[in-house]
Structure formats: C-alpha cells, structure tokens
C-alpha cells in the first residue's frame, strides 16, 4: 500500500442542514480504515455520494462540509477535487498535490454513476492502483463506483464492510443456536422476505411494532385505530405455514399498551379488551416478560424494529426493556447480538447503547437485502 493510490468507496451520505452535518455516525465508522491507510502511507482518493442529485450538480449536495469534518477528525488536510472526473485523464494529477487524502466531488453528480456505466468506471479506475469498498450500506446498488470499478483494479473490502459481513454471517450462516429474531416495523410487506428467509434458520421470531397488530387482528382480536397494513392475510398465512413446517416459533404480543392518541396516557390491556377508538402503541408487561425470558435462553439475537411508538417515552418501555435485557446478556458474554434499521439505531442512540451490542448496522436497505438472502452487487463484485 506504500505510496499506492487507493480508490476508496465510502458511504458519507450524512444528513446535512445548511452545510452543517447533523449526524456524523457514518464518518466515525470509517475512520479506522482511513487511519490504517494513512499509516501505510497510501494516497487515498475517496468516492462517495450525498443525497439524490440525479446526475446534476446541486450545490447543496457538495461534499465540502464532509471534507471539513474529515479534516478535523483525521487532523490532516483533505483536498476536495472539484474537477470534472471525465476530464482527468491520468493518475499523475494527484502527484501535483502535497495532500494524502483526496475526495472526489459527489459521484452522483454524474448520471453515469447510477446507470452503472462501464466506461465511466474505467475512467475513474485510471486514477488509482487499488480499489477498496468500505460502503456496505451502498453495496445493494449496482452503481458504477460499487459494481464496475472492481472489473478494472485489484479490489478489496474495507475494515467496516468486513465487520458488517462477518456480523451478518453470524446471524445467517455461521449461527450459534438458539437464535431469536425480534422484528418490528409498520408493514409486513417490507419484511416478509426477511421473515421467510430467516424462519428455516431461526428458533424464534418475535413480531412487534405495527406489524404485530396484523397478527393480533388475524387471530380474532380488535386492534381499534392501531396502525396496520391492509390485505395481508395471505402473507400471514404463508409465515404461519412455513414456521410450522420449519419448527420455528412465531411469537406476537399477549397484552398491549393502548391510548386514544399518540400523546395520550398509557393503559395496559389484554388483547380482547382493546376498544375501537384506541390504538396499540407498545407491548404489555406479560409480553415483555415472555420476550426477556426468550432472550435469556438465546445464544444469538437479531433485532430489527422497536416494540412500540418509542418517540413518546410513555410508549418506549417495551423497547427499552428489550434493549436492557440484550445488553445484560451481552455483558455476561452469553449472547451474540446484532441490531439494525433506522428506528432501532435511533432508539439505541437515545439510550447511549450502540456500543453495548456486538454489532449495530447503519446500512438500511443493504442490511435488509442481506437478511433476505439476496446477493448484493457490491459483494458479488468483490468476490
């Protein structure tokens, strides 16, 4: 790596408000890879995108604030290359600068990126000697900087991508049983493929959140004005039938916390007591008790989706108890724990508990597609 030019694909798609970064998680996660390459005296050329400029230059989506943040964190000068990539013909242009860390301007300013254009990828590959993908969260996209560049250069995974794939393998292929999945979210249709793929490998699948309301209603109970998805009985039947065949237990709430509105006071109810003007906003104490016992008896746990409307502290108790129980087992080295999904990560951030899990994925779509058993273009390209 010494003095080699490393094309490093990162996901620096951080939330920006008026040129200010509001959450630096994605930047913090890739610092080990950057520091490793700096230590090896490599020249680093970073490729990333922010937002959806759709192949046009959008000033508000420049990587300039990200360069400034990287500069602060690395304590090193970081140069933003604003030149049109398509007009840079050779890698020697990097030698004109003294810096060791370069960032090419938003790769999605070029329509060729999302079109997975082979010629565009070849042009970019001319700038480097080696390609490294440390953007697991973008690896479900067949885009030029993810899928095509590896055709032109020796290509490797970055440290963060490696961690992510190894952690996900421990819940999909190299499993220590008993293994439990706690899965939530508002729509079954967005998680059906994950559930179907996991049933044959898992001992327990615990359904919480808005999705659980469909199960509660399917088994003959009133869910009032609760959030639920329409027309999904067929999906439920499919889940129930596969789980029986594969001897995987499907668990849904036995009691619930309801209120008349999102800001109302919480009330604990049995499933047959929910009134038509009430909404289910969390799991009840009996359900919490059941879930914590299952966690105690598990060796591996995957958590994707809070148990209730955790944004209101009145309805966050179920999710907090799940988090506490997983952390307790983690600290005692009794469990391997993986969590992922925007709301789950947000909840763990609120509890300052992100580092209390073996692995917390911030990868969103790529995380779910991996759990669905799909091949991710970025991983396929590296293989």
Model segments located where?
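Active-site loop-to-helix "anion-binding N-cap" substructures in soluble metabolic enzymes
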Residues: 1-383
């Amino acid at each position: 790596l010494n003095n080699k030019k490393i094309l490093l694909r990162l996901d620096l798609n951080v939330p920006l408000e008026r040129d200010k970064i509001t959450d630096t998680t994605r930047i913090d996660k890739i610092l080990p890879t950057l520091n490793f390459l700096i230590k090896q005296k490599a020249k680093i050329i970073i490729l990333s995108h922010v937002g959806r400029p759709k192949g046009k230059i959008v000033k508000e989506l420049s990587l300039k604030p990200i360069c400034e943040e990287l500069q602060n964190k690395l304590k090193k000068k970081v140069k933003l290359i604003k030149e049109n990539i398509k007009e840079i013909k050779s890698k020697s242009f990097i030698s004109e600068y003294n810096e060791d860390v370069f960032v090419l301007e938003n790769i999605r300013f070029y329509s060729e990126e999302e079109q997975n254009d082979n010629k565009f990828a070849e042009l970019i590959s001319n700038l480097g000697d080696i390609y490294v993908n440390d953007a697991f969260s973008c690896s479900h996209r067949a885009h030029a900087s993810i899928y095509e560049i590896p055709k032109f250069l020796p290509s490797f995974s970055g440290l963060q991508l490696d961690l992510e794939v190894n952690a996900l393998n421990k819940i999909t292929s190299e499993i220590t049983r008993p293994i439990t999945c706690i899965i939530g979210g508002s729509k079954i249709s967005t998680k059906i493929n994950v559930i179907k793929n996991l049933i044959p490998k898992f001992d327990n699948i615990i359904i919480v959140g808005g999705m659980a309301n469909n199960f509660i209603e399917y088994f003959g109970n009133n869910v009032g004005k609760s959030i639920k998805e329409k027309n999904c009985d067929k999906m439920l039947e499919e889940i129930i039938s596969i789980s029986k065949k594969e001897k995987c237990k499907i668990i849904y709430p036995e009691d619930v916390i309801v209120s008349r509105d999102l800001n109302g006071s919480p009330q604990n109810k049995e499933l047959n007591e929910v009134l038509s003007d009430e909404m289910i906003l969390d799991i009840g104490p009996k359900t919490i008790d059941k879930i914590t016992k299952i966690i105690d008896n598990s060796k591996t746990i995957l958590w994707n989706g809070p148990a209730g409307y955790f944004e209101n502290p009145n309805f966050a108790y179920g999710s907090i108890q799940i988090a506490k129980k997983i952390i307790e087992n983690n600290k005692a080295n009794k469990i391997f724990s993986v969590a992922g999904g925007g709301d789950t990560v947000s909840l763990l951030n609120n509890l300052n508990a992100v580092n209390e899990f073996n692995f917390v994925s911030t990868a969103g779509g790529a995380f779910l597609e991996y759990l669905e058993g799909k091949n991710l273009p970025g991983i396929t390209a590296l293989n």
